[in-house]
C-alpha cells in the first residue's frame, strides 16, 4: 500500500518529526480556506501515489490564497500518469538552505534493512546514482540487533551535520523515526526526498513516502480502512478483484487473461506477448477454483471496457475443468450476452465434461496453449 504524502507525513509527525503546517483539500473552496489559515505563500501538492508529480504539473506554489484557489481549479481532475487528482495537500512554503536524500528500504539479498543517504537531494535516487554515485552512502541494519547509535552517527555525519549541534540532533531523530516507522508499520520503503535544512536552520522532511507491505495490512486496520475509502493507485477492477479474493493486476493491453496459478498465468501472458498481443491483466483464480470463482473472474473481464478477447488457460489438478466451464457458462448468462470472444485451453480433471459444456455454448476449446494464445491475439486484432 502506497501512502499519500500527507499520510506519510502524519506518520513522521506521530514519531516526533516536525513537518511544515498543511492540510488536505477536496475542493477549491477548501484550498482557499486552508491557504488563509496557514498563510501564503503555500504549496499545492497533488495527492497521487506516483513519482514525478512536479514535472507533470502536480506541484504549484501560490503567493496568495486567491492564487491558490485559481491554481487548484486547474489541478483538481488532472491526469498524472493515469491517476486522477482528487486531493490536494496545501502546505506552508518553506525556504530551503540545502536539500538531502534519505530513505530506508529492505535489501532482500542481504536480508537486512538498508539506509540510503546522500547530501544531494531533490531528485530521484536513480538520478543521483547515475550522476553522483560517490555521494550515496549505504548503511545496513540487521533486524536482529536493530538500529544502533553508530548507524545513526554514520548516516547523519554523511549528510553533513556536525555532532553536538541542534541540527545533528534533529537529523538523528529523523533517522530513528524512519526506522521505527519501517518496523512498526511493516513498511517496504520509508523515504524523505528532499530532507531539507530551512533558512531558519531546522531539519525537516519536505516530502515523505511510505510503502506498507500489503500482506501486513491486517495488522493495521486504520490503513486498511484508508485503502478501502481511497484505492489510490488501485483501479476499480483491481479493487473489486481483491474484494472477491483474486490475484489481479491491471495492465494496458486488450487480451484478458485468466489462469490458475501464478506461474501458468504469467506463462500465458508471455505467450500472448510472443504472438504479438498485449495482455490487459494478470488474473490468477488459484487452485481448486469453484464455478462461482470462475464466474466472477470472467464477469470482471466481460465488463472491462478495454478487453476484446478473454483467454482462459487452465490446468486441472484440483481445479476441475467442468467447474471452470460451468463458471464461464454462468458468467455469459448473467451478463446477458456479449460481443467479446472467449478462448479456452483446459487440460486435466474432468476435461471431457468441460469440453461438452463449452461446446453447448459455442466457446472454442484448444488442446494447445500456443494455439489458443495465437487465436486470442488474432481475434483481438479484428
From Swiss-Prot:
Pathway named in the protein's UniProt entry: Carbohydrate metabolism; tricarboxylic acid cycle; succinate from succinyl-CoA (ligase route): step 1/1
Binding-site positions, ATP: 45, 52-54, 94, 99
Keyword rRNA processing: no
Cofactor or coenzyme needed: Mg(2+)
Gene3D superfamilies noted in UniProt: ATP-grasp fold, A domain (3.30.1490.20), ATP-grasp fold, B domain (3.30.470.20), Succinyl-CoA synthetase domains (3.40.50.261)
SUPFAM superfamilies: Glutathione synthetase ATP-binding domain-like (SSF56059), Succinyl-CoA synthetase domains (SSF52210)
Positions annotated to bind substrate: 260, 317-319
Enzyme Commission number(s): 6.2.1.5
Occurrences of domain ATP-grasp (ranges): 9-240
Comment on bound cofactor: Binds 1 Mg(2+) ion per subunit.
Catalysis performed (reactions): succinate + ATP + CoA = succinyl-CoA + ADP + phosphate; GTP + succinate + CoA = succinyl-CoA + GDP + phosphate
GO cellular component: succinate-CoA ligase complex
Binding annotation for Mg(2+): 193, 207
GO annotation, biological process: succinyl-CoA metabolic process; tricarboxylic acid cycle
Similarity field: Belongs to the succinate/malate CoA ligase beta subunit family.
Subunit and partners: Heterotetramer of two alpha and two beta subunits.
Function: Succinyl-CoA synthetase functions in the citric acid cycle (TCA), coupling the hydrolysis of succinyl-CoA to the synthesis of either ATP or GTP and thus represents the only step of substrate-level phosphorylation in the TCA. The beta subunit provides nucleotide specificity of the enzyme and binds the substrate succinate, while the binding sites for coenzyme A and phosphate are found in the alpha subunit.
Record protein name field: Succinate--CoA ligase [ADP-forming] subunit beta
Organism: Pyrobaculum aerophilum (strain ATCC 51768 / DSM 7523 / JCM 9630 / CIP 104966 / NBRC 100827 / IM2)
Lineage of producing organism: Archaea, Thermoproteota, Thermoprotei, Thermoproteales, Thermoproteaceae
Amino acid at each position: 500500500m502506497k501512502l499519500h504524502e500527507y499520510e506519510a507525513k502524519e506518520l513522521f509527525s506521530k514519531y516526533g518529526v516536525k513537518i511544515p503546517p498543511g492540510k488536505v483539500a477536496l475542493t477549491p473552496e477548501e484550498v482557499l480556506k486552508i491557504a488563509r489559515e496557514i498563510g501564503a505563500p503555500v504549496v499545492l501538492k497533488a495527492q497521487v501515489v506516483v513519482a514525478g508529480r512536479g514535472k507533470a504539473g502536480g506541484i504549484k506554489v501560490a503567493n496568495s490564497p486567491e492564487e491558490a484557489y485559481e491554481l487548484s481549479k486547474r489541478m483538481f481532475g488532472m491526469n498524472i500518469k493515469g491517476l486522477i487528482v482528487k486531493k490536494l495537500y496545501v502546505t506552508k512554503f518553506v525556504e530551503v538552505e540545502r536539500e538531502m536524500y534519505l530513505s530506508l528500504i529492505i535489501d532482500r539479498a542481504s536480508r537486512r534493512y538498508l539506509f540510503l543517504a546522500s547530501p544531494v537531494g531533490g531528485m530521484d535516487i536513480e538520478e543521483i546514482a547515475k550522476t553522483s554515485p560517490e555521494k550515496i552512502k549505504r548503511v545496513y541494519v540487521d533486524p536482529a540487533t536493530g538500529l544502533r547509535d553508530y548507524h545513526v552517527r554514520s548516516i547523519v555525519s554523511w549528510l553533513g551535520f556536525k555532532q553536538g549541534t541542534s541540527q545533528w540532533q534533529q537529523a538523528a531523530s529523523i533517522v530513528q523515526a524512519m526506522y521505527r516507522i519501517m518496523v512498526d508499520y511493516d513498511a517496504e520503503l520509508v523515504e524523505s526526498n528532499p530532507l531539507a535544512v530551512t533558512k531558519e536552520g531546522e531539519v525537516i522532511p519536505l516530502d515523505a513516502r511510505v510503502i506498507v507491505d500489503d500482506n501486513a495490512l491486517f495488522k493495521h486496520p486504520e490503513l486498511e480502512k484508508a485503502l478501502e475509502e481511497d484505492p489510490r493507485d488501485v483501479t476499480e477492477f483491481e479493487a473489486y478483484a481483491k474484494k472477491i479474493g483474486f490475484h489481479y493486476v491491471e495492465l494496458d493491453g486488450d487480451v484478458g487473461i485468466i489462469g490458475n496459478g501464478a506461474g501458468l498465468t504469467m506463462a500465458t501472458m508471455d505467450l500472448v506477448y510472443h504472438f504479438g498481443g498485449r495482455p490487459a491483466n494478470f488474473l490468477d483464480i488459484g487452485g481448486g477454483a469453484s464455478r462461482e470463482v470462475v464466474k466472477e473472474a470472467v464477469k470482471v473481464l466481460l465488463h472491462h471496457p478495454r478487453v476484446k478477447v478473454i483467454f482462459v488457460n487452465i490446468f486441472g489438478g484440483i481445479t476441475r475443468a467442468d467447474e471452470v466451464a460451468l463458471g464461464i457458462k454462468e458468467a455469459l448468462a448473467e451478463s446477458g450476452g456479449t460481443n467479446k470472444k472467449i478462448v479456452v485451453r483446459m487440460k486435466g480433471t474432468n476435461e471431457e465434461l468441460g469440453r461438452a459444456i463449452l461446446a453447448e455454448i459455442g466457446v472454442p476449446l484448444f488442446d494447445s496453449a500456443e494455439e489458443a494464445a495465437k487465436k486470442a491475439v488474432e481475434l483481438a486484432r479484428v
